[in-house]
Amino acid sequence: MAAMAVGGAGGSRVSSGRDLNCVPEIADTLGAVAKQGFDFLCMPVFHPRFKREFIQEPAKNRPGPQTRSDLLLSGRDWNTLIVGKLSPWIRPDSEVEKIRRNSEAAMLQELNFGAYLGLPAFLLPLNQEDNTNLARVLTNHIHTGHHSSMFWMRVPLVAPEDLRDDIIENAPTTHTQEYSGEEKTWIWWHNFRTLCDYSKRIAVALEIGADLPSNHVIDRWLGEPIKAAILPTSIFLTNKKGFPVLSKMHQRLIFRLLKLEVQFIITGTNHHSEKEFCSYLQYLEYLSQNRPPPNAYELFAKGYEDYLQSPLQPLMDNLESQTYEVFEKDPIKYSQYQQAIYKCLLDRVPEEEKDTNVQVLMVLGAGRGPLVNASLRAAKQADRRIKLYAVEKNPNAVVTLENWQFEEWGSQVTVVSSDMREWVAPEKADIIVSELLGSFADNELSPECLDGAQHFLKDDGVSIPGEYTSFLAPISSSKLYNEVRACREKDRDPEAQFEMPYVVRLHNFHQLSAPQPCFTFSHPNRDPMIDNNRYCTLEFPVEVNTVLHGFAGYFETVLYQDITLSIRPETHSPGMFSWFPILFPIKQPITVREGQTICVRFWRCSNSKKVWYEWAVTAPVCSAIHNPTGRSYTIGL
């Protein structure tokens, strides 16, 4: 049968389905669709024109089977190759009570039969503003029984009536007409998934028409859980050789959908009758093969998209060998460090002193030695003499450093097994070098570590890095909201998972406004009273109707003069993959209207044993303060 099943785009192949409104012979049709290269078939579970009666006699008791037998296909084929479709006459939100009640019963009958067949997914239409009863019937179905189907809501990218020329002037306006026409369908979807309490089993099948909305509307859709994209054959153009192709704008949208690994569904009749129907699918394959290749960062991050990880706590915990190994593979970070040390050595030691002036370098938090090697390479490149101390608190990593020293470094490097804050240095350093930054700059306690070590830096000494700044940006992402919600632990407060940050490769999300600087730290810190607690207020203008789910955190650091590292999207160091962004979630999604401002308050707090963040949204509405007193998350000193 078909090569693949619903639910996965294996490798680089496009996963695709054929949408049909009527299937007289199911086994024959499935065979023909598979022969054309499609992986699954979308079809009605009941005959689309068979209106069942559930209320009135005698039609209510009409004899005979309601639909065809499940024995026409094997259980495996039902499980993997068929996506069910709701009959088009079912209208659970009809204002006519008889139609509504009949529709409710018919909808449950079809959903239950789909569950009985074990269908992997079921398509339901969202084609009007009010879908409240549809949401109730579906939610009740999800919460009863032990089935595991996904429910794909078929939502048009642009509402069909917005394309009509005959819209009646001065007609009474409905609620959603306070939104622009091209935003209507997103509002339908947002209200629907809110009514369904963000169920992970409800996703979007986005129907793409000939006309596309503006980029910000498309951007917002790409933060939604899109599982499928429905492409009508009518949107395809014809090239010189008679083959179906898409406009440049549509191609760009397809490239973005391919990144989300959506499945494509072709619907409609063959508009290119000289060509086989499979030519539509072949064109999608062609686009997939010719999309821009992934960069080094995307290749490294493959498989980690939207996967939540707890931030490392290298001060409190000793890292494992594999963790060091991953970070050491970064091609950019250490070359930037080498360049910074090289420049610093040239600035500190004039040419005429290069044979007599020996610079004392201390690598604080040496790990398995990558910064020591970068320092030695920089000294060689600059033709300057250095004396190195490699200070590391993890006794397991010290074994690696001592082996390096024995086999490679020799007496030029002194390995010190100690916490840098407690070490009594035999001399003062000209340069201290460290890589203590986390995804939010200071979240691995670089300020506390370097402040505790700066007493053994000379008065004119240099710290590499010399400065770092965290950044925040508001984001919308159903996927991440649901991932955080699923992190609930048995013995903790039921909302504790919303009061802690996560390191995550952001993928299925929409950034609502440009990142803004949050906290800045400089080294050496010459303040007479050093205090690393911080408080900032950030205001983000939002130009689109949307929903806020949390904040993405980034950082930039100045290693030395003009040598920098950054994970802020606008200035991201090309090819660097040592850090994924950080996510600060919020407990309750907040609806934001176009033109409103999101105001967030962020605190960095500490006591003698730990550091933590607190955060709260104060506009357009107030949230609770998250993580007060560090009750859900702290970073151990």
From Swiss-Prot:
The modification N-acetylalanine is found at residue 2. GO terms for biological process: circadian regulation of gene expression; DNA-templated transcription termination; endothelial cell activation; Golgi ribbon formation; peptidyl-arginine methylation; spliceosomal snRNP assembly. Residues 488-494 are annotated as: Dimerization. One of its GO terms (cellular component) is nucleus. It catalyses: L-arginyl-[protein] + 2 S-adenosyl-L-methionine = N(omega),N(omega)'-dimethyl-L-arginyl-[protein] + 2 S-adenosyl-L-homocysteine + 2 H(+). A protein binds at residues 327, 435, 444. Keywords: Acetylation, Biological rhythms, Chromatin regulator, Cytoplasm, Golgi apparatus, Methyltransferase, Nucleus, Repressor, S-adenosyl-L-methionine, Transcription, Transcription regulation, Transferase. Disulfide bonds: none annotated. Residues 465-637 are annotated as: Beta barrel. The active site is at residues 435, 444. Pfam families: PRMT5, PRMT5_C, PRMT5_TIM. Its main location: cytoplasm. PROSITE patterns: SAM_MT_PRMT. InterPro entries: Arg_MeTrfase (IPR025799), Arg_MeTrfase_PRMT5 (IPR007857), PRMT5 (IPR035075), PRMT5_C (IPR035248), PRMT5_TIM (IPR035247), SAM-dependent_MTases_sf (IPR029063). SUPFAM superfamilies: S-adenosyl-L-methionine-dependent methyltransferases (SSF53335). CDD domains: AdoMet_MTases. Its EC number is 2.1.1.320. Activity is increased by EGF, HGF, FGF1 or FGF2 treatments, and slightly decreased by NGF treatment. It is found in: Cytoplasm; Nucleus; Golgi apparatus. The keyword S-adenosyl-L-methionine applies. Gene3D superfamilies: Divalent-metal-dependent TIM barrel enzymes (3.20.20.150), Hnrnp arginine n-methyltransferase1 (2.70.160.11), Vaccinia Virus protein VP39 (3.40.50.150). S-adenosyl-L-methionine binds at residues 324, 333-334, 392, 419-420. Arginine methyltransferase that can both catalyze the formation of omega-N monomethylarginine (MMA) and symmetrical dimethylarginine (sDMA), with a preference for the formation of MMA. Specifically mediates the symmetrical dimethylation of arginine residues in the small nuclear ribonucleoproteins Sm D1 (SNRPD1) and Sm D3 (SNRPD3); such methylation being required for the assembly and biogenesis of snRNP core particles. Methylates SUPT5H and may regulate its transcriptional elongation properties. May methylate the N-terminal region of MBD2. Forms, at least, homodimers and homotetramers. Component of the methylosome complex, composed of PRMT5, WDR77 and CLNS1A. Found in a complex composed of PRMT5, WDR77 and RIOK1. RIOK1 and CLNS1A associate with PRMT5 in a mutually exclusive fashion, which allows the recruitment of distinct methylation substrates, such as nucleolin/NCL and Sm proteins, respectively. Interacts with PRDM1. Identified in a complex composed of methylosome and PRMT1 and ERH. Interacts with EGFR; methylates EGFR and stimulates EGFR-mediated ERK activation. Interacts with HOXA9. Interacts with SRGAP2. This is Protein arginine N-methyltransferase 5. It comes from Pongo abelii (Sumatran orangutan).
